[in-house]
Amino acid sequence: MSYYFKNLKPDLNSDVEEDDGNLLESIMANKSKREIDEQESSDDELKTLSFGSLKKAETVIDEEDFKDTKPVHKKPITTTYREESFDEDEDSEDQSDEDAGFFEEDSEDETHHGQKVPKKKSKHAPVEQSSKKRVPRVRNIPGLEIPRNKRSNLYRDIRFDKSTGKALDSSIIRKRYQFLDEYREKEIDELQKLLQDRKFLSKIDQGEREEMEQRLKSMKSRLQSMKNKDLEREILKEYENDMNKNNNTRYHLKKSEKRKVVQKWKFDHMKTKQREKVMERKRKKRLGKEFKQFEFHNRR
C-alpha cells in the first residue's frame, strides 16, 4: 500500500462540509444583525421627526400621485333622431306602416354643446323647443322695446317709461319734485365757495377746475330754465282764469297764443334798459329780413 493511501482519513469530506455550513451561518447571522441595527436606527430617526413634517411629507406624496394619475373625461353620448324613407315591399308583413321611420343613431356633428338639435320635418314646420328649457328673466315685450338711438343710455327715468303707464303731465311731475330745488341751490352755493377758495384751487389742476366751472354753469342754467317754465305756467294759468271768468265753457289757448301772452307779460315787466336791448335786437332782425328781399340778392 502506498504512502498516499496511508495518509487518507475517512472523515475528511465531512469536515469540509461542516466548515462551509458554519461559515454560511455566520454570514446569515451578521446580515440579520445588520438589518436589525438599520431598522432600529430608522425607527430612532422617525421618532425624532415632528408631526408637522410628517404631514407635509404626506401631502407632497399625495400631490405627486394626483399629478401622475390624469383624469379621464368621458365624452357624453347623445342620440339624435334622423328621418329616413324606405320603399314598401309587397310581400312584407307590415304593409300598413308608413313610408318613413325614425331610427336612433349616435352623431357628434349634429349636436351642439351636448344638447339635442331638433330637426324640422319640413322647412315650413314650426320650430320645436323643449318644455324643460327655462324662460329667460329679460324678455322683449312688444311695445316696450328700447329704440336703437337710446340703447346707449343705461339708466332711464322711470317716470317717463312706457311700462309704468301713461305719461303724466310735466306740471304734475314738477309739483311733486319741486322740493329738489333747495338741494340744487345748496349744491350750487357749495360749488361756488370751492371755486372761490384759493387753498382748494392750489391743490387741484387746471383740468379739474375747468370741469367744476362747466358743471356749475350747467347746474345754474338747468335751474333757471325750470324756474322760467314755472313762471310761464303761472302766467298762462292766471290769463286763462281771467278769460274764463264769465264763460260757461272753458276756453284754452293755442301754442302760438300762449307764446304771445308770455312775451307780452315779460316785455311789460322789463326794465327800461332791457326793453331798449330787446327793441334793438328786433329792429336788426327785421332789417336783415328786408335786406334779403332786395332784387340784387335774387340774381344768379
UniProtKB/Swiss-Prot annotation:
Composition-biased stretches (Acidic residues): 85-109
Entry's Gene Ontology cellular component terms: 90S preribosome; nucleolus
Modification Phosphoserine occurs at: S14, S41, S42
Regions of compositional bias (Basic residues) in chain numbering: 114-124
Main localization of the protein described in the UniProt heading: nucleus
Pfam families found in the cross-reference section: RRP36
Coiled-coil ranges per UniProt: 203-248
Keywords: Coiled coil, Nucleus, Phosphoprotein, Ribonucleoprotein, Ribosome biogenesis, rRNA processing
Region (Disordered): 33-146
GO-annotated biological processes: maturation of SSU-rRNA from tricistronic rRNA transcript (SSU-rRNA, 5.8S rRNA, LSU-rRNA)
UniProt record similarity statement: Belongs to the RRP36 family.
Oligomeric and partner information: Associates with 90S and pre-40S pre-ribosomal particles. Interacts with CKA1, CKA2, CKB1, CKB2, PWP2, UTP15, UTP17 and UTP22.
Name listed for the protein in its UniProt record: rRNA biogenesis protein RRP36
Organism in which the protein naturally occurs: Saccharomyces cerevisiae (strain YJM789) (Baker's yeast)
Source species taxonomy: Eukaryota, Fungi, Dikarya, Ascomycota, Saccharomycotina
